[in-house]
């Protein structure tokens, strides 16, 4: 073979190799597909944090409303790229409602995005549009007292655990619950003709946990639950009674396999 022919063949092999490498890289490194509404990766199950606000018979002060805003922003800031944040409220009908359908994965800030595959400015604008405006709407009306005949806290938490995007297949499930923790349904109620002997009136936590598991299964097992225990001076509950309510809940959560932590949420 003449040297010129050899060089030509060698160049063809090199070019073919380069083109093959480029094609392979384009195939392997193509951007993952994102859901346009949630910004979550398609066909992946991300870790999920839910902030649930109790709107039943809870009158939040202006200071508490501002702190709720901060709590949600802190939850947002704690997300790793790809993790999900949702807002829920327990409304006047005793129903859990996905507040303004807000449920968004963190795609990363614009400066964290690879500009070869996605437009950083569009990602940033999309994320801000899906977070800031719905958040502002979600906080509207928090200062209004909503008259509610029931407060199904236990049932609502268990129901969250049965959602497809928050069931036991979801890694690192976390709920931040903002509530006075005053359960009031047929399952059980903290209310009575008088508030004396509260500890004696509350049902056995093991029985409550068993009733929930009979209805919802082990939906809450493994969930990390952070409770912001709302204090309201106008509601007449003494610190001693609030301590009894907290201890009762802690036993229920222990039986359900929930890892709970508590913080006071003063007026």
Language model features: what each stretch is:
Residues 199-267:
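Von Willebrand factor type A / integrin I
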Residues 53-55, 160, 172-184:
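DG-centered beta-turn motif at the end of beta-strands
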Residues 45-59, 136-143, 228-233:
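Acidic/histidine-rich, surface-exposed loop or edge segments in extracytoplasmic proteins
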Residues 2-50, 56-63, 77:
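Acidic, polar low-complexity linker/tail segments
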């Amino acid at each position: 073979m003449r040297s010129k022919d050899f060089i030509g063949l060698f160049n063809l092999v090199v070019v073919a190799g380069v083109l093959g490498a480029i094609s392979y890289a384009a195939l392997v490194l193509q951007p993952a597909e994102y859901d346009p509404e949630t910004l979550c990766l398609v066909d992946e199950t991300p870790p999920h944090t839910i902030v649930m606000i109790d709107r039943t018979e809870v009158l939040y002060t202006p200071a508490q409303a501002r702190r709720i805003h901060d709590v949600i922003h802190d939850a947002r800031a704690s997300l790793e790229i790809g993790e999900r944040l949702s807002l829920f409220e327990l409304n006047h009908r005793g129903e859990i409602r996905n507040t303004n359908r807000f449920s968004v994965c963190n795609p990363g800030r614009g400066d964290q995005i690879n500009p070869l595959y996605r437009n950083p400015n569009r990602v940033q604008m999309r994320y801000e549009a899906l977070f800031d405006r719905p958040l502002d709407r979600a906080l509207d009306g928090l200062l209004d007292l909503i008259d509610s005949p029931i407060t199904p806290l236990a049932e609502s938490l268990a129901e969250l655990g049965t959602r497809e995007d928050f069931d036991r297949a979801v890694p690192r499930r976390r709920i931040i619950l903002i509530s006075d923790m005053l359960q009031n349904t047929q399952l059980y109620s903290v209310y009575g003709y008088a508030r004396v002997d509260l500890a004696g009136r509350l049902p056995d936590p093991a029985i409550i946990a068993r009733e929930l598991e009979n209805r919802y299964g082990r939906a809450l097992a493994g969930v990390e639950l952070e409770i912001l225990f709302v204090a309201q001076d106008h509601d007449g509950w003494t610190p001693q009674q609030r301590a009894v309510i907290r201890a009762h809940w802690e036993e229920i959560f222990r039986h359900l396999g929930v890892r709970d932590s508590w913080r006071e949420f003063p007026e």
